[in-house]
């Protein structure tokens, strides 16, 4: 799994406008991105649980939250924004995938000074649990209306990533679930909610793919990571959200043709030495065994840039557990040349990473992470892949044949998939269900 430092995330999202739309799970997605743009540390449990605060890590509450009233009704609103010299990240809290409020959000994005470069979105749990017995059928219709409107409103350069809803625990105590009251529909059971979420994920994936939007299957990625669920069975801890951020950032980099640093997973468990909210600092440990990659005390650890600078050929040390070949003269492995991927154009140039052409659009193929995941700092390593190690990457779905660069000196930029123009009949408007 790709692991990035704050300095590398700042470069990747340089002059980018990122919009996050969703419920409280995606509020934590927004918070982790904002934190990772500034610090190499994880969210604290308090930061994950707090909602509607006036400020979080130098962001600003723009609407709702503590500026209004904190509650769990379907009309709850919360709009947050983090803005620096070269980064803009905004969050909109949603309780329904398409509604009059969502329409107002789309109009705001369309009329703003800066068009969004990335939209990260999911809405599912509220939709299938708070809107009556026919909530699933309404959800399907609203998804069709949403993606149709997205086709009309979003610029072709905008990358929309639809996230599937994450897995649920066996016991759900989330406060947003409806209670038995006043003769309305009864409280939904855990089994029924899980079944509805599965059906909603399948349908949203198909609908997003039909409209040529990207899908990141979070339900797949976290299906074996339930130990990172919070006690309410819905929300996730700081380690899960950092992995989620890495998945999203890797997806963006792949879409923009940016090559990220490759750090092989050889160190012990990340959680053994980093606690929530602790800035990443390399600490000595006695139980690590042979320090194959131990940094010299006179040479402090410095993370590599997104593309390694050219230098002397480096022969990588052998990995533990792999058979060592007999000593022999090895040809040098030249590193990639330094390429300027991140320009200093005016703030929020929405087409910074794109080259528009009429060539066939690219795609992603499916990948899989197996087992649990961990996080830890990585030393600089040469651009060399031992034959006994196989890297893995995010599960993404595009529906277009993927294009691979033919060499380290090839042009890495790739066209974004162009959505076919949608022509809606005059005078007809889709309305929220």
UniProtKB/Swiss-Prot annotation:
Residues 386-433 are annotated as: Disordered. Disulfide bonds: none annotated. It comes from the Eukaryota. Coiled coil: none annotated. Belongs to the PC-esterase family. This is PC-esterase domain-containing protein 1B. The gene is Pced1b.
């Amino acid at each position: 799994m790709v692991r990035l430092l704050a300095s590398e995330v700042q470069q990747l999202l340089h002059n980018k406008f990122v919009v996050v739309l969703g419920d409280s799970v995606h509020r934590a997605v927004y918070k982790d991105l904002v934190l990772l743009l500034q610090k190499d540390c994880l969210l604290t449990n308090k930061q994950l649980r707090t909602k509607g605060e006036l400020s979080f890590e130098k962001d600003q509450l723009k609407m709702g939250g503590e500026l209004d009233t904190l509650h769990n009704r379907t009309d709850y609103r919360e709009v947050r924004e983090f803005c620096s010299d070269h980064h803009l990240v905004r969050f909109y809290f949603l309780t329904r995938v398409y509604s009059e409020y969502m329409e107002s959000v789309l109009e705001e994005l369309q009329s703003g000074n800066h068009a969004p470069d990335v939209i990260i979105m999911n809405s599912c749990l509220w939709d299938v649990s708070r809107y009556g017995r026919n909530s699933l059928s309404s959800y399907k219709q609203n998804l069709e209306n949403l993606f149709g409107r997205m086709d009309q409103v979003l610029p072709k350069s905008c990358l929309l990533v639809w996230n599937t809803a994450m897995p649920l625990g066996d016991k759900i105590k989330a406060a947003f679930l409806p209670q038995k009251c006043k003769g309305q529909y009864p409280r939904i059971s855990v089994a029924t909610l899980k079944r509805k979420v599965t059906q909603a994920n399948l349908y949203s994936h198909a609908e997003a793919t039909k409209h040529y939007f990207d899908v990141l299957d979070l339900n797949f990625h976290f299906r074996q990571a339930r130990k990172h669920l919070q006690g309410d069975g819905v929300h996730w801890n700081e380690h899960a959200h950092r992995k989620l951020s890495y998945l999203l950032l890797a997806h963006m980099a792949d879409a923009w043709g940016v090559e990220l640093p490759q750090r092989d997973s050889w160190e012990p468990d990340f959680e053994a030495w980093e606690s929530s909210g602790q800035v990443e600092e390399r600490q000595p440990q006695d139980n690590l065994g042979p320090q194959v990659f131990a940094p010299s005390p006179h040479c402090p650890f410095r993370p590599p840039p997104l593309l390694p600078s050219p230098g002397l050929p480096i022969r990588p040390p052998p990995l533990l557990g792999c058979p060592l070949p007999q000593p022999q003269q090895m040809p040098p492995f030249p590193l990639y040349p330094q390429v300027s991927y991140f320009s200093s154009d005016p703030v929020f140039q929405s087409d910074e990473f794109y080259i528009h052409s009429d060539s066939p659009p690219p795609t992603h193929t499916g990948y899989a992470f197996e087992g649990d995941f961990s996080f830890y700092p990585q030393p600089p390593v040469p651009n060399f892949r031992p034959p006994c190690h196989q890297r893995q990457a995010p599960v993404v779905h595009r529906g277009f044949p993927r294009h691979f660069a033919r060499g380290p000196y090839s042009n890495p930029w790739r066209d974004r998939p162009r959505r076919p123009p949608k022509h809606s009949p005059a005078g007809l408007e889709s309305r929220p269900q």
